[in-house]
Regions:
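A structural motif corresponding to the C-terminal end of an alpha-helix
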Residues: 40-46, 115-121, 146-151, 205
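Short acidic/polar active-site loop segments enriched in Thr and Asp
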Residues: 9, 47, 120-123, 153, ...
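N-terminal small/glycine-rich loop or linker at the start of catalytic domains
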Residues: 4-26, 77-97, 121, 126
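N-terminal binding-site loop/beta-alpha segment at the start of enzyme catalytic domains
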Residues: 1-75, 148, 229
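A cross-domain feature marking catalytic cores of carbohydrate-active enzymes
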Residues: 15-17, 51-53, 78-80, 126-129, ...
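Short, acidic/polar
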Residues: 27-42, 99-118, 136-138, 165-170
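Beta/alpha (TIM)-barrel catalytic core signal, keyed to glycine-rich beta->alpha loops juxtaposed to Asp/Glu
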Residues: 132-257
Length: 257
C-alpha cells in the first residue's frame, strides 16, 4: 500500500534541474541521483512530476524516460515553451528564429516530448508561455487536435497574462475545444502579483492554479542568509544572481538586498 501524503495539497515535483551536465538549468546530472530524489518524493506519498521540453535542452524528459517513470507509478506533466523572438538558449534541434506555437512546431515538440519520456501520452501538457507571433486561434486548434489524438489527458497554460487567459478560454468555449483546466504560475511571499487579477479570472473559468517557486528559489528557507558572499551561492542555482535577477524567483537582486 503506497504511503499517505502528509499534506492535503497536491505536491508536484519539478524536474527542471534534472538533465545532462552542461545544459541549461541542469544541476542533478546523474541518473542515480535523480532516482534517489524520486524515491524520497514517492516515499512521502506523492506521484506527480512536472518537466518541460525546455528543461535541460530536452534532457530532463530523457532522464525521466530512462528512469521508467511509468513503471514507478508516477504521473507526468510536461510543457512546450516558445522561444521565437526571445533571447534564450536553444536546444540542438531548434530552427532558425526559435520555436513558435504554430502547428508544425507544436506537433514536432509534442512528439519529441513523448519520445523522450517513452510514452504515448502524458497526463497534463502545457503551453509553457505565450507565443505572441502566432494567433491563439491557430494554436488552440492544434492543441485540440493533439488532445483528441491522445497525446495528453489535460490541457494547461503557464505564464500568461490574465487577459490572455480569458481570450484563450473564450476561444475554446466558442469553438468547442478542450479547455485549459490548470494554470501554472509563480507565487510566493515575495511574488504575489497573481492575486490582483489572475486569480479572479481563473476562478471565473474554473481553472486550477498550480504554484511554482513557492519558496522563492530557496530564499524562504534557511539555506541562504544575510551577508552571504557571491562565492557562497552555488553557481547556476535558483538563487544565483544572473543579469540582475535572481534565477528562478522572478525577483531582482536589489529587492532581496
Amino acid at each position: 500500500m503506497p504511503p499517505t501524503p502528509k499534506s492535503p495539497l497536491n505536491i508536484i515535483f519539478g524536474a527542471m534541474t534534472f538533465g545532462r551536465a552542461g545544459t541549461a538549468q541542469a544541476r542533478v546530472t546523474s541518473l542515480e541521483e535523480c532516482a534517489a530524489i524520486l524515491d524520497i518524493f514517492q516515499a512521502h506519498g506523492h506521484t506527480e512530476i512536472d518537466t518541460a521540453r525546455y528543461y535541460g535542452a530536452g534532457t530532463s524528459e530523457e532522464y525521466l524516460g530512462e528512469l521508467n517513470w511509468q513503471d514507478r507509478g508516477l504521473v507526468m506533466d510536461t510543457k512546450f515553451y516558445p522561444t521565437a523572438g526571445k533571447n534564450m538558449p536553444e536546444d540542438d534541434g531548434a530552427p532558425e528564429g526559435g520555436w513558435n506555437h504554430g502547428e508544425e512546431h507544436l506537433r514536432e515538440n509534442v512528439g519529441r516530448s513523448l519520445e523522450a519520456l517513452r510514452c504515448e501520452g502524458v497526463d497534463l501538457w502545457y503551453l509553457h508561455g505565450p507565443d505572441r507571433t502566432t494567433a491563439f486561434e491557430e494554436t488552440l486548434r492544434v492543441v485540440n487536435a493533439l488532445y483528441k489524438e491522445g497525446c495528453f489527458s489535460r490541457f494547461g497554460i503557464s505564464n500568461y497574462m490574465a487577459w490572455e487567459v480569458a481570450q484563450i478560454c473564450e476561444i475554446c468555449r466558442r469553438e468547442g475545444y478542450v479547455m485549459p483546466t490548470v494554470y501554472q504560475g509563480v507565487y510566493n511571499a515575495l511574488h504575489q502579483t497573481v492575486e490582483q487579477e489572475l486569480f479572479s479570472c481563473l476562478r471565473y473559468y474554473g481553472v486550477a492554479f498550480y504554484a511554482y517557486n513557492p519558496l522563492a528559489g530557496g530564499y524562504l528557507t534557511g539555506r541562504y542568509w544575510r551577508g552571504m558572499q557571491d562565492g557562497e551561492v552555488e553557481r547556476g542555482s535558483r538563487f544565483d544572481v544572473q543579469g540582475g535577477e535572481v534565477a528562478g524567483t522572478g525577483v531582482s537582486g536589489e529587492v532581496l538586498e
